[in-house]
């Protein structure tokens, strides 16, 4: 990653991405048949329960209702650890709080600031990184140090975590909360409400950020582009949808077998849906292995309904 300013080219590319994934959705939204409805929830719930048994896991799923489809819900209002899914609304909070020129601000840091899973930040200790580069690293590579530096930049009287939670409250999310930075936020024991959200809450936040007006078009385009080029989600929601669906996402992984993914997906005709899939395997203890295949199979169930 070169240390250079956030230029017009990057913004134009991001705007092009936003048009490509949403333009056909606007065109198609009025053409969807009124008969497009979801099947009875019991059948899907049984399939999700079977996945829980097979993977020895707890699964949470939420797909918000659209004008012609009912919501898909399974443990949608149970709390799950954020893990790195918080980085998508974190970047949105930074974009919301500042003008686009803020993306060129250089942030310097030392080796003492490097945290686990920081593949990008650890390469730039000598040069520092711009806010724009930190946003890119936090979303596309789930870089923990980048996220902590963005939290510090977000600032506020109670610190970055309080400012982040406050941003969620401004979007109407009264459930989610962030209490710690990376990597501690991934380590809270089962049943602890710190650093948690629900599939329902995070899905509605993502809906506002990508499909709503929580961000102006230019900033929304940047967030959409970074999520579209995410490098960590190939085996999760993306794996569960057919190749002709467009998917943008942000993953999260943590202790106690936690594996999450939040996404916006577009059908081949351009119809958008928000999909949140969260999981943990607390019964396996602190070192339980996250199961990406569980998320992929849950996404396949969702895709089968939406298709």
UniProtKB/Swiss-Prot annotation:
<dbReference type="GO" id="GO:0008800">
    <property type="term" value="F:beta-lactamase activity"/>
</dbReference>
<feature type="binding site">
    <location>
        <begin position="251"/>
        <end position="253"/>
    </location>
    <ligand>
        <name>substrate</name>
    </ligand>
</feature>
<dbReference type="InterPro" id="IPR023650">
    <property type="entry name" value="Beta-lactam_class-A_AS"/>
</dbReference>
<keyword id="KW-0378">Hydrolase</keyword>
<keyword id="KW-0574">Periplasm</keyword>
<dbReference type="GO" id="GO:0030655">
    <property type="term" value="P:beta-lactam antibiotic catabolic process"/>
</dbReference>
<feature type="active site" description="Acyl-ester intermediate">
    <location>
        <position position="84"/>
    </location>
</feature>
<keyword id="KW-0732">Signal</keyword>
<dbReference type="GO" id="GO:0005576">
    <property type="term" value="C:extracellular region"/>
</dbReference>
<dbReference type="InterPro" id="IPR000871">
    <property type="entry name" value="Beta-lactam_class-A"/>
</dbReference>
<dbReference type="GO" id="GO:0005886">
    <property type="term" value="C:plasma membrane"/>
</dbReference>
<dbReference type="InterPro" id="IPR012338">
    <property type="entry name" value="Beta-lactam/transpept-like"/>
</dbReference>
<keyword id="KW-0046">Antibiotic resistance</keyword>
<keyword id="KW-0472">Membrane</keyword>
<dbReference type="Pfam" id="PF13354">
    <property type="entry name" value="Beta-lactamase2"/>
</dbReference>
<feature type="binding site">
    <location>
        <position position="142"/>
    </location>
    <ligand>
        <name>substrate</name>
    </ligand>
</feature>
<keyword id="KW-0964">Secreted</keyword>
<dbReference type="GO" id="GO:0046677">
    <property type="term" value="P:response to antibiotic"/>
</dbReference>
<dbReference type="InterPro" id="IPR045155">
    <property type="entry name" value="Beta-lactam_cat"/>
</dbReference>
<keyword id="KW-0997">Cell inner membrane</keyword>
<keyword id="KW-1003">Cell membrane</keyword>
<dbReference type="GO" id="GO:0042597">
    <property type="term" value="C:periplasmic space"/>
</dbReference>
<feature type="active site" description="Proton acceptor">
    <location>
        <position position="182"/>
    </location>
</feature>
<protein>
    <recommendedName>
        <fullName>Beta-lactamase</fullName>
        <ecNumber>3.5.2.6</ecNumber>
    </recommendedName>
</protein>
<comment type="similarity">
    <text>Belongs to the class-A beta-lactamase family.</text>
</comment>
<comment type="function">
    <text>Extended spectrum beta-lactamase (ESBL) that inactivates beta-lactam antibiotics by hydrolyzing the amide group of the beta-lactam ring. Displays high levels of penicillinase and cephalosporinase activity as well as measurable activity with carbapenems, including imipenem and meropenem. Plays a primary role in the intrinsic resistance of M.tuberculosis to beta-lactam antibiotics.</text>
</comment>
<feature type="signal peptide" description="Tat-type signal">
    <location>
        <begin position="1"/>
        <end position="34"/>
    </location>
</feature>
<feature type="site" description="Increases nucleophilicity of active site Ser">
    <location>
        <position position="87"/>
    </location>
</feature>
<comment type="subunit">
    <text>Monomer.</text>
</comment>
<feature type="site" description="Functions as a gatekeeper residue that regulates substrate accessibility to the enzyme active site">
    <location>
        <position position="117"/>
    </location>
</feature>
């Amino acid at each position: 990653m070169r240390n250079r300013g956030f230029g017009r080219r990057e913004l134009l590319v991001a705007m092009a991405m936003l048009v490509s994934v949403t333009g056909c959705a606007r065109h198609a939204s009025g053409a969807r048949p009124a008969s497009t409805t979801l099947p009875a929830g019991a059948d899907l719930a049984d399939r999700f329960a079977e996945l829980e048994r097979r993977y020895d896991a707890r699964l949470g799923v939420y797909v918000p209702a659209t004008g012609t489809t009912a919501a898909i819900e399974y443990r949608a209002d149970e709390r799950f650890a954020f893990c790195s899914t918080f980085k998508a609304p974190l970047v949105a909070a930074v974009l919301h709080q500042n003008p686009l020129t803020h993306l060129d601000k250089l942030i310097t840091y030392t080796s003492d600031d490097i945290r686990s899973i920081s593949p990008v930040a650890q390469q730039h200790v000598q040069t520092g990184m711009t806010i724009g580069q930190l946003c890119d690293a936090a979303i596309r590579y789930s870089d923990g140090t980048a996220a902590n530096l963005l939290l510090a930049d977000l600032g506020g009287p109670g610190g970055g975590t309080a400012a982040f939670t406050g941003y969620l409250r401004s979007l109407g999310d009264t459930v989610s909360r962030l209490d710690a930075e990376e990597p501690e936020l991934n380590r809270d024991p089962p049943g602890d409400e710190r650093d948690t959200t629900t599939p329902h809450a995070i899905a509605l936040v993502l809906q506002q950020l990508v499909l709503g007006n929580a961000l102006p078009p230019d900033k929304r385009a940047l967030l959409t582009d970074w999520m579209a080029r995410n490098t960590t989600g190939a085996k999760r929601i993306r794996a569960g949808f057919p190749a002709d669906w467009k998917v943008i996402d942000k993953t999260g992984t943590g202790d106690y077998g936690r594996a999450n993914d939040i996404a916006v997906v577009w059908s081949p005709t351009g119809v958008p849906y928000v999909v949140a899939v969260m999981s943990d395997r607390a019964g396996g203890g602190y070192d339980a292995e996250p199961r990406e295949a569980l998320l992929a199979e849950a996404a396949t169930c969702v895709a089968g309904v939406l298709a």
